[in-house]
Curated annotation (Swiss-Prot):
<dbReference type="InterPro" id="IPR044862">
    <property type="entry name" value="Pro_4_hyd_alph_FE2OG_OXY"/>
</dbReference>
<dbReference type="InterPro" id="IPR023550">
    <property type="entry name" value="PKHD_hydroxylase"/>
</dbReference>
<feature type="binding site">
    <location>
        <position position="161"/>
    </location>
    <ligand>
        <name>Fe cation</name>
    </ligand>
</feature>
<dbReference type="InterPro" id="IPR006620">
    <property type="entry name" value="Pro_4_hyd_alph"/>
</dbReference>
<dbReference type="Pfam" id="PF18331">
    <property type="entry name" value="PKHD_C"/>
</dbReference>
<keyword id="KW-0479">Metal-binding</keyword>
<dbReference type="Pfam" id="PF13640">
    <property type="entry name" value="2OG-FeII_Oxy_3"/>
</dbReference>
<keyword id="KW-0408">Iron</keyword>
<keyword id="KW-0560">Oxidoreductase</keyword>
<feature type="binding site">
    <location>
        <position position="96"/>
    </location>
    <ligand>
        <name>Fe cation</name>
    </ligand>
</feature>
<protein>
    <recommendedName>
        <fullName>PKHD-type hydroxylase XCC2773</fullName>
        <ecNumber>1.14.11.-</ecNumber>
    </recommendedName>
</protein>
<keyword id="KW-0847">Vitamin C</keyword>
<feature type="domain" description="Fe2OG dioxygenase">
    <location>
        <begin position="78"/>
        <end position="180"/>
    </location>
</feature>
<dbReference type="GO" id="GO:0005506">
    <property type="term" value="F:iron ion binding"/>
</dbReference>
<dbReference type="GO" id="GO:0031418">
    <property type="term" value="F:L-ascorbic acid binding"/>
</dbReference>
<feature type="binding site">
    <location>
        <position position="98"/>
    </location>
    <ligand>
        <name>Fe cation</name>
    </ligand>
</feature>
<dbReference type="GO" id="GO:0006974">
    <property type="term" value="P:DNA damage response"/>
</dbReference>
Length: 228
């Protein structure tokens, strides 16, 4: 399931993040890439152990915790601490698939995270740069994503994807992975659609007798499928 989620960050949070990231020291993004990805990757990345990276990561995690849509769609069990990258001057990242498992370096690499869901949080105004589209190959074909600053897109970690060359300006984003309670994307999509339908029915017809039954179906499916 490819899903844009708007306004994960507020304007105040965006301003705070931009101020901190503008003052950061960036490194060659290939340092953190796997062998195959390093051949396609050309960008700058904020070192994971830098104080600014940790502060910015905490801010993003706090924003995610307030997004009911993110929780409903991803059903997170673990979230890899958000990372930050920057593209400019024609930089790009060719087609690749994310590693199946990431090891959280902030915990000494001892805490593996299965990358069921990939996520990109856009931090630059789309009018401030040319190119930089996130191109994702999914079951419905090729999807090109370029969202307003503060908006998030999530998609299956199994997806082949790339970042197009940035030919003008600078594209800054946060990216991270989620280990979901449901590793199966089709099951996540089904429960998300059911949850959205229950919420709409609650708004349109409060007290409808089917709400209790539908909510029970949701939780019984989650109970059957969840890995917790």
């Amino acid at each position: 399931m490819l899903l844009p989620i708007p306004d994960v960050l507020t304007p105040a949070q965006l301003s705070q993040l931009s101020e901190r990231l503008d003052a950061a020291d960036w490194a060659d993004g290939r340092i953190t890439a796997g062998h195959q990805s390093a051949q396609a990757k050309d960008n700058a990345q904020l070192p994971e152990d830098s104080p600014i990276a940790r502060e910015a990561s905490a801010l993003v995690l706090d924003a995610l915790s307030r997004s009911s849509t993110f929780f409903s769609a991803a059903l997170p069990r673990r979230i890899y601490p958000p990372l930050f990258n920057r593209y400019s001057g024609g930089q790009s990242f060719g087609y690749h698939v994310d590693n199946a498992v990431r090891y959280d370096r902030s915990r000494g690499g001892a805490d593996p995270v299965r990358t069921d869901v990939s996520a990109t949080l856009f931090l630059s105004d789309p009018d401030s740069y040319d190119g930089g589209e996130l191109v994702i190959e999914d079951t419905y074909g090729t999807q090109s994503v370029k969202l307003p600053a503060g908006h998030l897109v999530i998609y299956p970690g199994t997806s082949l994807h790339k970042v197009m060359p940035v030919t003008r300006g600078t594209r800054v984003a946060s990216f991270f992975w989620i280990q979901s309670m449901l590793r199966n994307d089709a099951q996540r999509r089904l429960l998300f659609e059911l949850d959205v339908s229950i919420r709409r029915l609650t708004q349109d017809t409060p007290g409808h007798p089917s709400l209790i039954q539908l909510t029970g179906v949701y939780h019984n499916l989650l109970r059957q499928w969840a890995d917790v």
